[in-house]
């Protein structure tokens, strides 16, 4: 790694995950955004061998370090990830969406994964859904990826899939009690927006509401330092929101998902998605450094808005 560090000057990496599981459940199995437990443990071995694990307070300081984060507040954060991090004495941040806490409702992407899972089980379901969507059965998957939550609910009724019952049975998200336990154990609890909506589709007022609502919950849970991670990344987000976050919104640091990148806002940091199951952490991180080096030659390694 020494060559990459010397060439780029980028000493800190920010790997992130959604969940860790050897038995992916239907609400995320079709999304491919998960890491097996073995891969995750191998990742941690790589990171701890080459970098120092640091707290959120040290994110942005250029030293050979890494900070882990996990998005969407999924239940495996408590049942799988939490014990591993405690055993290895590693710091991390959990970014949550308050709409899903205590399994009150389901994230649209998880609804779509469930629908896609059901498609595999029944040709009758495929026919019903293709009729509803007015598309060929072979095009159902691409159509489903474009629907909103209300459409997903309507389609679920067609094939007798009950999202509310699934939430009760499987409890896919963290509970308030679990979040407070994580916080009391020394982990950072961060803001991932109220409902995981894509911020580049929202008005400025809607964006602020998504952030402020979660900030209020975090303060009730005793969280003093506020950090925000954009759902779906920060593509096409206007400078106006960044200025508001830092000056009025109480956000100390914010995060995107663009990999190893520089940013025009020094308090905004980019993370590296680790959920590429066929690749090791070393392969993923080296590829990020190589891509950064290529972009720097073209003067495109810094995000400008």
PLM regions with names:
Residues 2-69, 107, 113-115, 201-305:
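C-terminal active-site subregion of NodB/CE4 polysaccharide deacetylases
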Residues 2-7, 82-87, 173-184:
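Short amphipathic alpha-helices and their capping/turn segments at secondary-structure boundaries
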Residues 69, 73-81:
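Membrane-embedded segments
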Residues 80-98:
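A short alpha/beta connector and helix-capping loop motif
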Residues 88-90, 185-189, 247-253:
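Glycine-enriched alpha-helix->loop->beta-strand junction motifs that scaffold or abut catalytic
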Residues 104-185:
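Extended, charge-rich helix/loop segments that form flexible
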Residues 170-188, 195-221:
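Alpha-helical scaffold elements lining the catalytic groove of polysaccharide deacetylases
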């Amino acid at each position: 790694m020494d060559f990459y560090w010397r060439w780029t000057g980028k000493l800190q990496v920010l790997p992130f995950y959604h969940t860790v599981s050897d038995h992916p459940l239907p609400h995320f199995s079709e999304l491919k955004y998960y890491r097996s437990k073995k891969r995750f443990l191998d990742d941690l071995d790589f990171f701890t061998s080459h970098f120092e694990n640091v707290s959120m307070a040290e994110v942005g300081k250029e030293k050979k370090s890494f900070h882990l984060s996990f998005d969407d507040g999924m239940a495996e954060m408590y049942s799988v990830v939490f014990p591993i991090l405690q055993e290895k004495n590693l710091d991390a941040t959990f970014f949550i969406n308050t709409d899903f806490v205590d399994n009150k409702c389901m994230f649209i992407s998880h609804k779509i994964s469930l629908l896609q899972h059901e498609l595999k089980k029944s040709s009758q379901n495929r026919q019903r859904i293709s009729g509803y969507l007015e598309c060929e059965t072979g095009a159902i998957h691409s159509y489903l990826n474009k629907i909103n939550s209300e459409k997903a609910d309507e389609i679920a009724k067609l094939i007798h899939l009950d999202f509310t019952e699934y939430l009760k049975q499987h409890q896919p998200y963290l509970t308030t009690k679990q979040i407070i336990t994580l916080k009391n154990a020394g982990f950072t609890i961060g803001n991932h927006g109220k409902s995981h909506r894509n911020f580049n589709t929202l008005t400025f007022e809607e964006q602020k509401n998504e952030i402020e609502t979660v900030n209020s919950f975090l303060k009730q849970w005793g969280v003093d330092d506020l950090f925000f991670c954009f759902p779906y990344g920060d593509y096409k987000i206007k400078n106006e929101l960044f200025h508001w976050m830092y000056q009025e919104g109480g956000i100390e640091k914010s995060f995107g998902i663009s990999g190893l990148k520089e940013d025009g806002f020094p308090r905004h940091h980019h993370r590296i998605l680790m959920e590429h199951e066929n690749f090791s952490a070393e392969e993923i991180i080296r590829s990020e450094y190589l891509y950064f080096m290529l972009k720097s030659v073209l003067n495109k390694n810094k995000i400008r808005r």
